[in-house]
């Protein structure tokens, strides 16, 4: 199952929910939310912020959450050259402010 389903199921609030539906993708879930077939959707925050930025006033992101997750980048263990290039690119993006601009665009709460 998805991490969202697992996180919701672990939360005591899930006992107050009439039904928890699983979807194969976020687009289908958000379409059902838009048409009123759902009351709420649980998605990764970055996904939710992306959709709310594209549909201003149509969706609302709650400040509550069901926990946090960490993500990583997987590389072949022996690909030291790619690792060095990736590290250098990330360091450069942090140094020149590009990383902060990306974070501001995609991860911060939209103005309401």
Per-region residue spans from a language model:
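Bilobed "Venus flytrap"/periplasmic-binding protein-like clamshell domains
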Residues: 1-25, 45-49
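Phosphate- and divalent-cation-binding pockets in alpha/beta enzyme and binding domains
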Residues: 6-7, 32, 50-51, 85, ...
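Short helices/loops that flank or line small-molecule/ion binding pockets
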Residues: 10-11, 26-42, 46, 54
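Surface-exposed patches in mature extracellular/periplasmic domains of secreted proteins
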Residues: 20, 63, 101-105
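Short helix-initiation/N-cap motifs at beta->coil->alpha
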Residues: 20-31, 69
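Structural recognition of the beta-strand scaffold that forms the well-ordered cores
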Residues: 21-22, 40-43, 62-63
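Periplasmic-binding protein-like
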Residues: 27, 45-112
